[in-house]
Amino acid sequence: MKLSIEGIKDKKEWEKAGIKLPSYDVEKVATATKEAPVWVHFGIGNIFRIFIGGIADSLLEQGLSDKGITCVETFDYDVVDKIYTPFDNLVMAVTLKEDGSTDKKVLGSLTEAVKAQSAVEEDWSRLKTIFASPQLQMVSFTITEKGYALHDAKGEFFPFIKSDIDNGPDKASSAMACLLYTSDA
């Protein structure tokens, strides 16, 4: 068993292991989302993957949506390279229940992972395309003060914010600058 689009096609192995698979067509959802993104999320760590990703998965399972989430990482770009890309953006959600048993489920609602890194032209261009999409409806966040803080205790801009101001939109690095400069595409 491999957590990948190809791997989840062998449904019997996953069922035998007690792992629930999406009932929706993950590839179709990913394609539809890439063509017309409706939901972008900044900060794609553990809390996001299971809780917010779980909400999107539930909407897909109930037929209330036909699109997933475009995932954007602003801080730890290895998350995209090591957690999303190798597994085709699929996530294994494991919930520990009060009786000690677990529910295991593959989430297919996280359809694309993008680095909010202006130095990576392909990703930066993709973000601009996403934010120019007339179908985009929602932007959500699970970021800490590292992502939204602008000033230090003295009221001065943090060095990374000052750098964003000095260098302009083509070299944005902070979450807020990435949001500002890509949404102004």
Segments from the language model and where they lie:
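Intrinsically disordered, low-structural-confidence terminal and linker regions
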Residues: 3-6
